[in-house]
Amino acid sequence: MIFYDFEVFKYDWLVVLKNTEDRTTTVIHNDPERLKQFYEQYKKDIWCGFNSRHYDQYVLKAILCDMNPYDVSQYIIAQRQPGWKYSSLFRKIQLFNFDVMTDRYKGLKQLEGFMGSNIKETTVPFDIDRPLTKRELQEVIEYCQHDVEQTMEVFLNRIEEFESHM
């Protein structure tokens, strides 16, 4: 399984990918070719994210289709449109996606609180209109890694939900 989370800014995007089989963590920043290679290597695996059904899978597919992930992100978030409507090309990309978010009204931060976990936020604004500095990038990577780890915790606490889909 691959647990993943994207963070998208106007001039930067990154994804944290945790492979549960070999326990490796991969961070990809603004490198579509590296993401394509990773996807090709693991496209037969199950990819798990929090709200990935409505957001992350479309950012992934946009990058795989050489589209601007910021445009897709804005389409989904600012314009409140479903990601699948952005491009018919998305349907052609195989992705075995499992969304750990089973309740639309409970966000990851709320679940972290319920589990007694530390809630980590980023001070970097998502509407920043310039490339991230090295310090900001590092902060966002740490934030994203934390989100993936917490998504894995939520998954383990709700394993029966996953098993019911298998």
Predicted regions located by residue number:
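Acidic, Mg2+-coordinating catalytic module of metal-dependent nucleases/exonucleases
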Residues: 101-103, 107-166
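Short, conserved catalytic/metal-binding motifs centered on acidic residues
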Residues: 5, 49, 147, 151
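Conserved DEDDh/DEDDy metal-dependent 3′-5′ exonuclease domain
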Residues: 21-110
